[in-house]
């Protein structure tokens, strides 16, 4: 492809609304342009990268026996109403009516559609197991689209669903998809962690996310270098240490206008780990008091799961409700003597603490030497805390590390949630009708592209891994007015094409600096430069990922470039 003909509108200035490297570079390198908030159009280079990632996904899915289909993006409401998810998705779901006033949505996910297909087409155990997948556009009306394609309202996703006769079969399908995902992300040149995760609105169990470590990631991950344990913040646990202390008598302490943990630490000169804080919530019309150690935060996703409610059904209580429940102003809530019907949710660490300090449910007072079991008991004891750096790994006891990550893939076992709701059954060998056991497996194609850029860039631009680069090689004649440079460049370009390599030639009549800057910005892995030394029969080869330049004889350059490309592709295979 000739750059003089390629639609590649590079930018010199950073777009004002671009906050992270991948967003900046996808715009600057001319991969995409913004159409509206959270909606982008892909230009030729961007489309080629998407296609490369999609082909890697297809190859690895097909390798595990999956079959590709294509479902409708427009979904009738009846399917989501059958599973009860028409309302669960809330405002994120794009809903619309046709001319006959029938409800539809633009698909945010496709569990219902795949299950509907299978319930109509699969009847016998002989048709199982089955894994179907598609690569298709999804739609979610994000409240605040940001970070380019990281959180957009329209995105390309590979979603797959496995259908098995039993849980043992699901385990096998799950492991197939796990292997496929590892190969996909390895081939894309990504460094990633596989973490335990919360399945969210999709339901299910044994949920794992493929996380690309990045400082701009929206997810928080806890991981252990010693044993390999990794989990996102909604699932991360830590080892709880019991404290072997003699229980002391409780004592009320006057703490005038001392409301926060920080103020209490300063006032009482005691470590924050000796406090237990009580947060009052409204949860689906009921009052919940949640307790965690004073130096920790409540993880509200964990709390939602414990209470079996949706995100929009949980909110912190206002001052009036806090006073009604505690009889005190905000800042003095505790577990002893709460008024009315209050569900007490106690973090699993609290029973192991001794002689801790809580609010007295009386303005300007706290209580010392409180102990779980002796002085109060919870209605629910569960892990509702966020882990922090240095907490001990629940598996091996080594210190945990905390990092941010970009979720690029998610696999989980749905079980029979959707097959039972939609009546997707099969007849077993004895003639018994049983629900099909399902798994769900997703990869964000756009996100994967952005994650690759986050891990592979420098101050000059993108550094594409060979497997996903829009082109393998760019041929750059420094001066197209020099007939010898031009002819040699054209000859090399055509011979590389004959070798089935993907090649750009920068045949534009612009300064050499512009050509080199654009080549670095768009990140083509190999640059062949034809300059003044061509008179001596020498051209230069430079890899985007390195600073060194290799001088090669003109007659050897095609062989050498082909060798480099093949080596780089092998490294990622």
Curated annotation (Swiss-Prot):
Domain notes: Consists of three domains: the N-terminal catalytic domain, the editing domain and the C-terminal anticodon-binding domain.
Main location: cytoplasm
Gene3D superfamilies: Anticodon-binding domain (3.40.50.800), Bira Bifunctional Protein, Domain 2 (3.30.930.10)
UniProt record similarity statement: Belongs to the class-II aminoacyl-tRNA synthetase family. ProS type 1 subfamily.
Subunit composition and interactions: Homodimer.
PANTHER family recorded: MITOCHONDRIAL RIBOSOME PROTEIN L39/PROLYL-TRNA LIGASE FAMILY MEMBER, PROLINE--TRNA LIGASE
GO terms for biological process, alphabetical: prolyl-tRNA aminoacylation
Protein name: Proline--tRNA ligase
An annotated GO cellular component: cytosol
Listed EC numbers: 6.1.1.15
Annotated NCBIfam families: PRK09194.1, proS_fam_II
């Amino acid at each position: 492809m000739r750059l003089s003909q390629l639609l590649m509108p590079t930018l010199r200035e950073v777009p004002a609304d671009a906050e992270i490297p991948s967003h900046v570079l996808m715009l600057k390198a001319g991969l995409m342009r913004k159409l509206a908030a959270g909606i982008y159009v892909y230009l030729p280079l961007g489309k080629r990268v998407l296609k490369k990632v999609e082909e890697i996904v297809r190859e690895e899915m097909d390798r595990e026996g999956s079959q590709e289909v294509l479902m409708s993006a427009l979904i009738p409401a009846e399917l989501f109403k059958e599973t009860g998810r028409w309302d669960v998705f809330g405002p994120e779901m794009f809903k619309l009516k046709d001319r006959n006033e029938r409800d539809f949505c633009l698909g945010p996910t496709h569990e219902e559609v795949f299950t509907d297909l299978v319930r109509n087409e699969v009847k016998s155990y002989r048709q199982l197991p089955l894994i179907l997948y598609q690569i298709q556009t999804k739609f979610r009306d994000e409240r605040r689209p940001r970070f380019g394609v990281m959180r957009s309202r329209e995105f390309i996703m590979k979603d797959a669903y496995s259908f098995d006769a039993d849980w043992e079969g699901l385990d096998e399908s799950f492991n197939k998809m796990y292997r496929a995902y590892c190969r996909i992300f390895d081939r894309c040149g990504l460094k990633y962690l596989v973490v335990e995760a919360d399945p969210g609105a999709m339901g299910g169990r044994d949920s794992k996310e493929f996380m690309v470590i990045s400082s701009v990631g929206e997810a928080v991950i806890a991981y252990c270098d010693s044993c390999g344990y990794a989990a996102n913040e909604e699932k991360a646990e830590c080892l709880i240490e019991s404290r072997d202390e003699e229980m002391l008598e409780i004592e009320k302490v006057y703490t005038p206008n001392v409301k926060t943990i920080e103020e209490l630490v300063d006032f009482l000169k005691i470590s924050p780990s000796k406090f237990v804080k009580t947060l009052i919530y409204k949860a689906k019309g009921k009052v919940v008091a949640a307790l965690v150690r004073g130096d920790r935060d409540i993880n509200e996703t964990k709390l939602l799961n414990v209470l079996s409610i949706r995100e929009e059904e949980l909110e912190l209580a206002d001052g009036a409700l806090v006073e009604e429940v505690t009889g005190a102003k905000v800042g003095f809530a505790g577990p002893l003597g709460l008024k009315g019907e209050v569900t007490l949710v106690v973090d699993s660490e609290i029973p192991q603490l001794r002689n801790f300090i809580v609010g007295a449910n009386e303005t300007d007072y706290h209580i010392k030497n409180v102990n779980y079991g002796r002085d109060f008991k919870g209605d629910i004891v569960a892990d509702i805390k966020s882990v922090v750096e240095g907490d001990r790994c629940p598996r091996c006891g080594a210190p945990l590390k905390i990092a941010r990550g970009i979720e690029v893939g998610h696999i989980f076992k749905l079980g029979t949630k959707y097959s039972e709701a939609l009546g997707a059954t099969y007849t077993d060998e004895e003639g018994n009708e049983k629900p099909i056991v399902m798994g769900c497996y997703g990869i964000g194609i756009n996100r994967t592209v952005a994650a690759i850029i986050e891990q592979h860039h420098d101050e000059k631009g993108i550094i594409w891994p060979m497997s996903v680069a829009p082109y393998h090689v760019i041929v750059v004649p420094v001066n197209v007015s020099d007939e010898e440079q031009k002819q040699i460049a054209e000859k090399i370009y055509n011979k590389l094409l004959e070798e089935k390599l993907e090649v750009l030639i920068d045949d534009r009549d612009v300064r050499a600096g512009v050509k080199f800057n654009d080549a670095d910005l768009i990140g083509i892995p190999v640059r062949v430069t034809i300059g003044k030394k061509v008179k001596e029969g020498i051209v230069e080869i430079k890899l985007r990922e390195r600073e060194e330049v290799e001088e090669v004889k003109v007659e050897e350059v095609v062989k050498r470039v082909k060798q480099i490309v093949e080596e780089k592709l092998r490294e990622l295979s």
